[in-house]
Amino acid sequence: MATRIRLKRLGMKKAPFYRVVVADSRSPRDGRFIEEIGYYNPTKEPAILQIDEEKAIKWLSSGAQPSDTVKALLNKAGILDKMAEKKAQA
């Protein structure tokens, strides 16, 4: 099963709120997901980003591919840097 880490859109019209989820790559954007690992609210000033670091690293190390947007968010949160350090130590 190919898994992706991506955003699930919630909220109202013109006021989006996203959950960062791990889902099967074949499931629809707002459909079924395996696990929720965080949330992102771009409407607040500054934008709120909360990601469970342990869960994200677990899924990335097991082969889950982040979408382009989630990759940028993980980079902003510093999780990809910690993942690279972990690989370098191994």
UniProtKB/Swiss-Prot annotation:
InterPro entries: Ribosomal_bS16, Ribosomal_bS16_dom_sf. Belongs to the bacterial ribosomal protein bS16 family. It comes from the Bacteria. It comes from Heliobacterium modesticaldum (strain ATCC 51547 / Ice1). NCBIfam families: S16. One of its GO terms (molecular function) is structural constituent of ribosome. The gene is rpsP. GO terms for biological process: translation. SUPFAM superfamilies: Ribosomal protein S16 (SSF54565). Keywords: Ribonucleoprotein, Ribosomal protein. This is Small ribosomal subunit protein bS16. One of its GO terms (cellular component) is cytoplasm.
